[in-house]
């Protein structure tokens, strides 16, 4: 069973027991269950259900595994012939979730 859902303005593809990295969910602790109701698409053994825009009775249950930081993204600027160099780094906060079940 596969599903496409929307969370925090982004769309994700999920299947049972998948681990997915999403932007940080503030206020949720490790081990807590979350319920996702904005499901766009479900595919189950040849049966395809498409929402307009969302599936009304669909729920995805996921468990928060941990909060982590992504690898460093480097932004480097320079100007030719001036000797100007600027190096900045950024690490995005992420939440790792595990899909427990998909119901429709």
Swiss-Prot record:
GO terms for molecular function: rRNA binding; structural constituent of ribosome. It comes from the Bacteria. Keywords: Ribonucleoprotein, Ribosomal protein, RNA-binding, rRNA-binding. Belongs to the bacterial ribosomal protein bL21 family. Part of the 50S ribosomal subunit. Contacts protein L20. PANTHER family: 50S RIBOSOMAL PROTEIN L21 (PTHR21349), LARGE RIBOSOMAL SUBUNIT PROTEIN BL21M (PTHR21349:SF0). This protein binds to 23S rRNA in the presence of protein L20. This is Large ribosomal subunit protein bL21. It comes from Karelsulcia muelleri (strain GWSS).
